Amino acid sequence: MAKAKFQRTKPHVNIGTIGHIDHGKTTLTAAITKVLHDRFPDLNPFTPFDQIDKAPEERQRGITISIAHVEYQTEARHYAHVDCPGHADYIKNMITGAAQMDGAILVVAATDGPMPQTKEHVLLARQVGVPYIVVALNKTDMVDDEEILELVELEVRELLTEYEFPGDDVPVVKVSALRALEGDPRWTRSVLELLDAVDEFVPEPVRDVDRPFLMPIEDVFTITGRGTVVTGRIERGTLNVNTEVEIIGIHEQRTRTTVTGIEMFRKLLDEGRAGENVGLLLRGVKREQVERGQVVIRPGSVTPHTQFEAQAYILSKDEGGRHTPFFENYRPQFYFRTTDVTGVVTLPKGTEMVMPGDNTAMHVQLIQPIAMEEGLKFAIREGGRTVGAGQVTRIVK
């Protein structure tokens, strides 16, 4: 029995199962934990099906979502895996980014082939930027005819190509999650093959620390005799003292300045890193030149915009959302990072109105510029109450 070493240095990757209801996403998730537990018991606890199926509810940007989080390790990597029990939970998770995915395992039952939710999940994966997909062709123990399996595989590949994934190159692995869970050696091997494919095909993500510096401003104050300080949580990158930065968003003009001090918990630091809450002392900047809602960035790394296309989920009445549909020219607030900005909504051709509980594409024109990139998340609010959540899929202007 090979004993795998636990290494903190193992690369960490976020993954999730997507696909049509009853195609076996949760069974596969349980099977992965069992197979890896049997292979490397000191690294992997086994998480049974019913524990994953009764996923706890989480609140993300005011939306309640059931998400099951499981962790496991292959020889090469450490994975955090998300599985959602209900279809609506998937849609909400993917749009709000409650659990970010560096890659997804698309589960398709060989007995059915691609179904409506298979398509919806693949489309959403494309729109919200899930970069890589590996296919688990599940329940293949129930299909005796090789030709049928080949046809289903072809259909899945065509579907992926249609939504701009590399359908010809994506690994498609034939598995039986249920039989693997029962301990059948042949199907246990199939799950290990699937994990090998994920190890190989889904690249390591670029860590937040290695990306260009960005910090949303939460608060601004003046320290007498020293100057203006902005505080916030560093979203990504690192920042050293005496580095030049740019402050953008909300106003037309951008402010260039140098950070002369970085403070955390009243201590001075040489550098601030992604995930830390810090105060930045800015040279020659007046208190009234900066405000909450702007961002401090590495100069030129991000630009402010007012028009974008987005994919959004609108809360149902039961979730505390609107009780009535909205129409063209709807004017809610869009909450980006730390602030609300009013925007005007244009609906896609053929969509007359959007009902509570729907997900929809939309075009938005903001009244003030916001520092944004594709993939940026936002909440849709009316007077401080969250009525929806979404993310930028394309910047228009």
Curated annotation (Swiss-Prot):
It catalyses: GTP + H2O = GDP + phosphate + H(+). It is an enzyme of class 3 (hydrolase). Residues 19-26 are annotated as: G1. Residues 138-141 are annotated as: G4. InterPro entries: EF-Tu_GTP-bd, EF-Tu_GTPase, EFTu-like_2, EFTU_2, G_TR_CS, P-loop_NTPase, Small_GTP-bd, T_Tr_GTP-bd_dom. HAMAP family: EF_Tu_B. PANTHER family: ELONGATION FACTOR TU, MITOCHONDRIAL (PTHR43721:SF22), ELONGATION FACTOR TU-RELATED (PTHR43721). Monomer. This is Elongation factor Tu-2. The lineage of its organism: Bacteria, Bacillati, Actinomycetota, Actinomycetes, Kitasatosporales.
